[in-house]
Amino acid sequence: MARKGLNKKYPCEKDGIVSRQRLNDIAKELFRKSIHVCSAFIPLFLQFMRLPVLFALTAALVLYSIAEFMRLKGKSIPLVSAVTAAAARKRDENRFVLGPVTLCAGIILAALLFEPFAASIGIYALAFGDGLASLAGKLFGKIKIPLTQGKTVAGSLTCFAAIFVSCFLVCYNAKIALCVASVGMFIELLPLKDLDNLFIPLVLGLVAQSLY
């Protein structure tokens, strides 16, 4: 009888474990994407202190890379290692967490290669489009898109809307915003993993500058 009782409880316990794992995944995604969203302040800072901001981003990229190599060798770096552990996904376990590197590199390259308005569009697309798409997919994504490694309709539509709005508020041109948002949504669908942090600001910055 006791054995039967345990068997009856097992599905509930399993559901509880799955729920906790999902909540943990959502919490990590919220933390990760809050960093993405904070990058929306970069275009404003670039207007007033361009060189110091670019220097700070480059220094952050280098210091983070050093900290990650040390972490992989078993040496913990105060604050940096804690932030990495809080943001790391399952696929990042025991690996160099590349996301912050590509995030900084994408922003730096966009700022260096494009006019300020185009760089801003690319950076905002990264901050809001990519940032909110993943959250929407985790929270509301029930319909999966085939051949996209788990991307969802909710995430893609959120990406499109966020890029369209942020682009329009920079250029006040609906056609450009529509084109940029469409390209951004397509990039978001590709299985680029952390490399989307590079492709989104660079490709969308180029599209915006070409069309404006």
What are these regions, as identified by a protein language model?
Residues A2-P146, K151-Y212:
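Hydrophobic alpha-helical transmembrane segments
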